[in-house]
């Protein structure tokens, strides 16, 4: 009987954890993302743990597919269905590695979430600041939150001190493609090489 009781408790706890959803309010959503990241990035956590947890967070909170389409721009029209599937598969791996490798060396980042600016029904900008330390100045960070589905906001871009990371990535991808005479599949090689490092 006790065994059955503990199994039921375990299943209930597991269901509660899996069914956790971030807030639908863009500002609160970003606050929850920031708070969760702080817990992941404490000094006592290993780099492997940080990488795993940050990847899980990104898969839940970032519109990776949307970022992938934006990063490719009009070049996506040159891909057939199978090539697009391969690109999206590679981009997700590329994005997660790029995202986690930038953050795992941080420990206990202090970010204050400040205000929101509703651009239109699809986008809200959430403004925040990475507080200064003895070694680094404060950094202004704007989160571009995609709100087409109001029940599930997703991050589409980070704008750091006025520099859009998504736009920078789009320009880098375009440079690779243009260097290879417009051959989009050459970008696949670049993505594979980055993931394999």
Q: Where in this protein do the model-derived segments appear?
A:
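Surface-exposed, charged secondary-structure patches
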Residues: 97-139, 190, 194-197
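Sec-dependent N-terminal signal peptides
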Residues: 5-13
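Sec/Tat signal peptide C-region and signal peptidase I cleavage site
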Residues: 16-21
């Amino acid at each position: 009987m006790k065994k059955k009781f503990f199994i039921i408790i375990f299943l209930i706890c597991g269901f509660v954890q899996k069914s956790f959803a971030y807030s639908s309010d863009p500002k609160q959503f970003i606050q929850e993302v920031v708070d969760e990241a702080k817990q992941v990035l404490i000094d006592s956590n290993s780099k492997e743990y940080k990488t795993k947890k940050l990847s899980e967070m990104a898969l839940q909170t970032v519109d990776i597919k949307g970022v992938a389409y934006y990063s490719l721009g009009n070049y996506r029209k040159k891909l057939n269905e199978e090539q697009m599937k391969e690109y999206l598969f590679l981009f997700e791996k590329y994005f997660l590695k790029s995202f986690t490798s930038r953050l795992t060396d941080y420990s206990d980042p202090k970010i204050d979430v400040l205000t929101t600016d509703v651009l239109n029904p699809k986008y809200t900008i959430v403004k925040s600041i990475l507080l200064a330390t003895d070694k680094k100045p404060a950094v202004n960070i704007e989160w571009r939150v995609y709100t087409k589905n109001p029940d599930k906001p997703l991050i589409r871009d980070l704008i750091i001190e006025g520099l859009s990371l998504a736009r920078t990535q789009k320009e880098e991808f375009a440079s690779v493609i243009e260097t290879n005479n417009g051959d989009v599949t050459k970008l696949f090689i670049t993505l594979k090489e980055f993931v394999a490092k």
